């Protein structure tokens, strides 16, 4: 391998928009700003909203279910 071709892997601080500061290591070599982190992301805070409006199969059956029905004489 060639010597001195790899970037320096240094400790940096990543600051979230909520104010949380995370110490990590990177080759970026400058402070990093984040939009979300584990302290403010809705999935990790329990404030996630789930939208259950019916699946694709239910929608398909409601639109095309009558086409496969047999007719009574």
From Swiss-Prot:
GO molecular function list: metal ion binding; rRNA binding; structural constituent of ribosome
Binding-site list for Zn(2+): 16, 18, 37, 40
Entry GO terms, CC: ribonucleoprotein complex; ribosome
InterPro entries per the UniProt record, alphabetical: Ribosomal_bL28/bL31-like_sf, Ribosomal_bL31, Ribosomal_bL31_A, Ribosomal_bL31_sf
UniProt keyword Ribonucleoprotein, yes or no: yes
Name of one Pfam family that matches: Ribosomal_L31
GO term, biological process aspect, one: translation
UniProt entry keywords in alphabetical sequence: Metal-binding, Ribonucleoprotein, Ribosomal protein, RNA-binding, rRNA-binding, Zinc
Required co-factors: Zn(2+)
UniProt cross-references to Gene3D superfamilies, sorted A to Z: Ribosomal protein L31
Cofactor note text: Binds 1 zinc ion per subunit.
Quaternary structure, from the entry: Part of the 50S ribosomal subunit.
Function summary: Binds the 23S rRNA.
Family note: Belongs to the bacterial ribosomal protein bL31 family. Type A subfamily.
Alphabetized PANTHER family for the sequence: 50S RIBOSOMAL PROTEIN L31, CHLOROPLASTIC (PTHR33280), LARGE RIBOSOMAL SUBUNIT PROTEIN BL31A (PTHR33280:SF6)
Entry protein name: Large ribosomal subunit protein bL31
Originating species: Pseudomonas fluorescens (strain ATCC BAA-477 / NRRL B-23932 / Pf-5)
Gene: rpmE
